Amino acid sequence: MIVNQALIELTKQVAVAVEEIKFSPNSTSNNSTPTNNKLKSSSSSISNCDSPSSKSKSNSSTSTPTSQPQTPSQLPQQAQQQAQQQHYSANSMNPYYAQQVLLQLQKPSTFVKHVHVVVKNTPFGITLRSKEPLQFNFQNYVIKATLLYDSDPPKMVDFIHNEPLQYVATVSEDGSEVCVDVKVGILSSQHQGSMFLVVLHISHCSAPTPSNSEPISTILTNIGNNSIHSLNVTNICVVSHPIRIVSKLDHVKKEGIPILKKRTFHEILTDKLKKLQKSQDSQSKWIKNLYQQHGAQYDMEPYNSTLHSQKTDSLCSSSTSTPSFNSTSSSSKNQSQSIKNEEEEDGGEDEEEEGGEDNDNESESSNTNSTQLIGKKSINKLPISTTTSSSNFNNLMVNNNINNNNNNNNNNHLIQNTTFSSTSHFQNSFNRVVEVYNLIPEYERVEVIRKMVQQLKSYDLEQLVSTFIDELKCGYESTIIS
């Protein structure tokens, strides 16, 4: 096997509880007698799986004697079985042990086996991550999972009709991670307390799919291919942590194993924010390097929404806006309300278009006077058309001129209150309509008005006229009251 850093690492394996069991290689395997070797080989072939309870008991310094009498021939066999349970042989065929040796870069004297307890028929996730996404991308590979006994040597889990293992693999968008949701089906009562391994076969799309009964030697070779410097990345195997299956969660509570707590919303949110901050820091470093390469100064000031809004407002106030003549509106009330809102927000934009001499920092009283003067100038400049539509439009503007003259006497009162009445809003809105009318060429005015009347429904047109008349009446009544 190639001893090097792994190309694919197992980053996460979900479980309801995790047990820790220490194991070490058998240092006395070379000095044992031939009879003991025969007993060891026979006991290893008989034992299909290891129970965590027996392993934890075998780790103790002294073993408790049994109450039943034992013959002398049975004592060495039991000692060999206990040694087999607490030690792996030097030439172990266990895939998990081989993977641990590869990850630790040397044969460990002792290592900890993390046994993950899962509930039967309940999915749990196994997350794999590629350390070199450019060299190895999960989107180009097919993943297959098989179930083995965690024994030495390992053994395939037999089944009659339905496979005991079901899985679904989900690859991330960039192909650097894959999450395999695994579910272990119903097993017989003989497997109670047994430990299993999930072997993930990762094969390239061009390579043939591995079989369910893949030889152990091939699995060990593919585990050795899991290296950054490996020349063969067509077939790679990754082994999960040992798994122990229980039928209910209450069994874990009875055994006294601490159950892993579910992550709270606060913990998940904090984790996500840390990941976002980490990615933003890395992006800032890349941007800073690009600025330095081009000899530009990098601004480290963070983004501020208030400053951004002030800059955009200043840009909008400095730029001139061209009013539009909306001829396809569906409701006259919505039209008048939108025009009033635009007049309140834009303030002095009308002065820049027609006056050209007023500044943006004038008071509201000067805005009112200027809009009224604009209305007078625009009305005086209006040409007289021979058509019926243009004459009606001119009569309406003459009436508005009369209202403007009446409202000039109330300017001082409006300045003192520093508020805009509905009449002034209507005047400003009407003046905007007049400005648009002046911008239209004389030979197109009649056609534009005709199209507007045709596009508007009869109900909308009546509502539009009634709204104008109501506004004119309100303005006339306000002048009488003042």
Curated annotation (Swiss-Prot):
It comes from the Eukaryota. Residues 24-88, 307-376 are annotated as: Disordered. Coiled coil: none annotated. GO terms for cellular component: nucleus. Transmembrane segments: none annotated. GO terms for biological process: sorocarp stalk morphogenesis. GO terms for molecular function: sequence-specific DNA binding. Residues 342-363 have a biased composition (Acidic residues). Residues 24-86, 312-339 have a biased composition (Low complexity). This is Uncharacterized protein DDB_G0270306. It comes from Dictyostelium discoideum (Social amoeba).
